[in-house]
């Protein structure tokens, strides 16, 4: 989508501009995450999405938080300009 393309472009541009200062810039692209926002979906709608997820389950806010913590911590110190898909494989 255009909005996803814009996020990718902004992430890469900011990473290039800020890298010389030792600042890393990355983005998280969450897939289907079970939150109060998804509570309004029907079981049929949820199943249609879940059937496309390689890992066979919805993600959790904790899954996204773990990715953020990784990128913000020492493990992510040499990663910049990347978009990390936290999607259970739905995007493959």
Regions found by a protein language model. Name each.
Residues 8, 25, 29-40:
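Short, flexible catalytic-loop segment of classical short-chain dehydrogenase/reductase
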Residues 3, 11:
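Active-site helix of classical SDR
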Residues 39-53:
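A short C-terminal helix-loop "cap" of Rossmann-like NAD(P)-dependent dehydrogenase/epimerase domains
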Residues 9, 27, 50-75, 79, ...:
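C-terminal helical subdomain
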Residues 16-20, 77:
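Alpha-helical segment proximal to the catalytic Tyr-Lys
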Residues 21, 26, 82:
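Rossmann-like NAD(H)/NADP(H) cofactor-binding core
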């Amino acid at each position: 989508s255009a909005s996803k393309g814009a996020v990718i472009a902004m992430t890469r541009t900011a990473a290039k501009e800020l890298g010389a200062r030792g600042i890393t810039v990355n983005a998280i692209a969450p897939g289907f995450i079970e939150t109060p926002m998804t509570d309004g979906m029907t079981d049929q709608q949820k199943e249609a999405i879940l059937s496309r997820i390689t890992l066979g389950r919805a993600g959790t806010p904790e899954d996204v938080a773990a990715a953020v913590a990784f990128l913000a911590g020492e493990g992510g110190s040499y990663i910049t300009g990347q978009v990390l898909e936290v999607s259970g494989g739905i995007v493959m």
